[in-house]
Design a protein with these regions (language model features):
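Macrodomain-like recognition of ADP-ribose-binding/processing modules
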Residues: 1-177
Length: 177
């Protein structure tokens, strides 16, 4: 199963405007290859409840960061909060809270299959109160998972997918925690 990070509103409009999903992002590529997906029908099918307070972006219906919608071999993640112009922004604390909810949701939906997640927060999402490298984000994701009590059960595994980057090394995992 692959985790696909959306914004808190599960936006499906792909384009270049600030509020759009960028075509080159993982989410944009997913939407490009699943053009007929009906996110609202999926939300309704699992009974996912929206937050009482709407998004900062136009008051749109939004969902708690970390909540998942299962779809075939994918886990669609409500990830980043939107600001008033539609940019993805969250604080470090909101990022950690999202991870805590994410682990619970994965535990609910993974069905003893391996799960792959990207380095969340390393795309165009902006952390409001701190600037973190991909290395630091990876360390936070790993540390958060280690603290979560109910791990994915063998033979299934959790994979964190990352691209080669000058700002990243598997040899440096754990240096920033």
């Amino acid at each position: 199963m692959k985790v696909i990070a959306f914004d808190e509103c599960f936006t499906t409009t792909v384009g270049e405007l600030p509020q759009d999903i960028k075509p080159s992002s993982i989410c944009g590529q997913f939407l490009g290859s699943h053009q007929n997906i009906n996110i609202q029908a999926l939300i309704n099918s699992i009974g996912l409840k929206p937050l009482k307070k709407g998004s900062a972006y136009k008051g749109n219906v939004c969902y708690e960061s970390g909540r998942i919608i299962p779809y075939n071999d994918f886990l669609l993640l409500a990830f980043t909060k939107l600001d008033n112009v539609g940019n993805g922004r969250m604080t470090r604390e909101e990022f950690l809270d999202c991870l805590e909810v994410l682990w619970k949701e994965i535990n609910k939906y993974y069905a003893y299959q391996s799960v792959a997640i990207p380095i969340l927060g390393s795309g165009i999402t902006r952390l409001k109160d701190v600037s973190l490298t991909k290395q630091q984000l990876l360390d936070m994701i790993i540390a958060s998972y280690k603290l979560y009590a109910e791990k994915i059960k063998l033979p299934a595994k959790l994979y964190i997918e990352c691209m080669r980057d000058d700002d990243f090394s598997l040899n440096k995992i754990g240096e920033y925690i």
